[in-house]
């Protein structure tokens, strides 16, 4: 049986130690991550996070989308959320540097909402979209954490289901999302890419 990594959190949800694949302890005492609603002050940093995704495999985004228009649209509906990584620069002085490392939105895209594959029995439903994770923080299951948060927020707002699109060729993403038990309810071609339509009751 292979070694299972273990992460330990303190009472403030701060990672205090992590076992690597060799069983060694990695000290991470000065790091804290949290998911919060984005603010006007976050706009430029979120835009940079979006732009750094351009050119990555299976990314359908371009220079114009998503842009400041989408960020302001999401902020205006209180539907944009970010994960902040806070790491102390000087433990003695207590100074910190916060960095946005992921984002997700509750979208309202007419093209997606018009698809006839969404279940009427699970209405009202909403789309989670514009999920982005900084390349420096890939392979840490952050995308899953953002989806869990997004689904919890949708449930809090009274939605009965969540739906979103995943590139059907993106095997890594498909494997990552498989743990949630989404139903594949259809396929579509949008933004020049083939997508699977995922849906799940909340």
Language model segments and positions:
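Short linear proline/tyrosine/threonine-rich motifs used for host-factor recruitment
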Residues: 15-20
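A short beta-loop-alpha structural element at the N-terminal edge
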Residues: 32-48
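Hydrophobic adenine-recognition pocket in adenosine-nucleotide-binding enzymes
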Residues: 38, 131-133, 166
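Acetyl-CoA-dependent GNAT
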Residues: 51-136, 147-148
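Conserved acetyl-CoA-binding loop-helix of GNAT-fold acetyltransferases
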Residues: 133, 139-152, 175-179
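Conserved GNAT acetyl-CoA-binding A-motif
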Residues: 147, 154-165
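Conserved beta-strand-loop-alpha-helix junction that forms the acyl-donor binding cleft
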Residues: 164-174, 190-194
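Conserved acetyl-CoA-binding loop of GNAT-fold acetyltransferases
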Residues: 178-187
